[in-house]
């Protein structure tokens, strides 16, 4: 009986039948937590709110991918937010997924609107603007991005490999280390009817991610060796402990310095301008702009007269007399920061 139990334990330890999150920590989560804390301390900071919105969108995308992977019955190790460096090259990989045969480098995209990939492999984003009109814009290829990330990892492996292993890496690395671009927004329509077939197999929606991985594993060569659970864990451990860069940044302090310094410095610049303008015109400072109006200027930072008029921060007479000069001060400060 003891022999049978040991045999069962050995089989279970050899084969992995469910996903394991080996590294869950995410830079985006740390940034989000820091921004939320700062938001409760700094009121009405438009730049902070824009940064928070961008970080939140990325975090939602990352979480969606982890959620989908954890629903799978595929035995795999999931590594989230892996940053590696080779000489002057740095790669920040959203996910590395290690399966018994293939390792996947995953780039997450959580975009508003739809994505079309044309016959040349160009990524084109389409969305409806505030005027309910369709807009199209080309975007940097996320596929090139994740391929570059994989290439950094390849360079690291080549540097550490023996002469014989280097030949194997050069020949087979791309075959066993696949790249995927995963579209995380469930409302995004992905149009790849004209895309090259080589690209169609590398871009998927999040809800089809597990299906893609299963297809690859099912269609792998029949005589392909499968890595055991211990081998997969060994590789995951090596990536996280030996290769992954941990910068230990304090994002709260970083963001606090960025957003409070920006506001305070611009405030002092506009106050200096107001004082000087009032002297030049022989008027009191309130006739340039009041303290309440100053806070609105700091909040929205308009850079055109049209925007200043639209926001209704200042009355028409102040815009006519001082508007362009105020805009110039904001633009000058923005360029210098």
Residue map of PLM features:
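Residue-level signal for well-ordered alpha-helical positions
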Residues: 109, 118, 193-194, 300
């Amino acid at each position: 009986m003891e022999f049978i139990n040991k045999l069962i334990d050995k089989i279970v330890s050899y084969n992995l039948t469910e996903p394991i999150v080996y590294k869950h920590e995410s830079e985006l989560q740390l940034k989000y937590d820091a921004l939320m804390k700062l938001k409760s301390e700094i009121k009405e900071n438009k730049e902070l709110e824009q940064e928070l919105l961008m970080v939140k969108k990325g975090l939602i995308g990352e979480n969606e991918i982890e959620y989908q992977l954890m629903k799978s019955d595929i035995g795999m190790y999931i590594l989230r937010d892996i940053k590696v460096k080779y000489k002057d090259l740095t790669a920040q990989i959203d996910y590395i997924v290690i399966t018994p045969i293939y390792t996947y480098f995953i780039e997450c995209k959580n975009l508003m609107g739809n994505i079309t990939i044309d016959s040349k492999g160009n990524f084109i984003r389409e969305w409806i603007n505030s005027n309910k009109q369709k807009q199209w814009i080309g975007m940097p290829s996320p596929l090139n991005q994740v391929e570059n990330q994989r290439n950094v990892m390849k360079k690291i492996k080549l540097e550490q490999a023996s002469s014989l292993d280097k030949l194997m890496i050069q020949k087979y690395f791309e075959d066993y280390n696949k790249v995927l671009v995963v579209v995380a927004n469930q409302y995004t329509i992905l149009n790849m009817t004209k895309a090259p077939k080589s690209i169609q197999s590398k871009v998927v929606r999040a809800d089809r991610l597990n299906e893609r991985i299963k297809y690859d594993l099912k269609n792998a060569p029949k005589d392909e060796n499968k890595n055991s659970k211990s081998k997969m864990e060994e590789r995951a451990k090596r990536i996280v402990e030996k290769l992954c860069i941990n910068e230990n940044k304090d994002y709260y302090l970083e963001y606090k310095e960025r957003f409070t310094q920006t506001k305070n410095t611009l405030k002092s610049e506009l106050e200096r301008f107001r004082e000087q303008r009032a002297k030049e015109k022989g008027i009191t400072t309130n006739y340039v702009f009041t303290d309440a109006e100053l806070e609105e200027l700091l909040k929205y930072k308009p850079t055109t007269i049209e925007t200043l008029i639209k926001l209704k921060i200042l009355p028409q007479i102040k815009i006519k007399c001082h508007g362009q000069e105020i805009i110039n001060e904001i633009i000058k400060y923005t360029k210098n920061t």
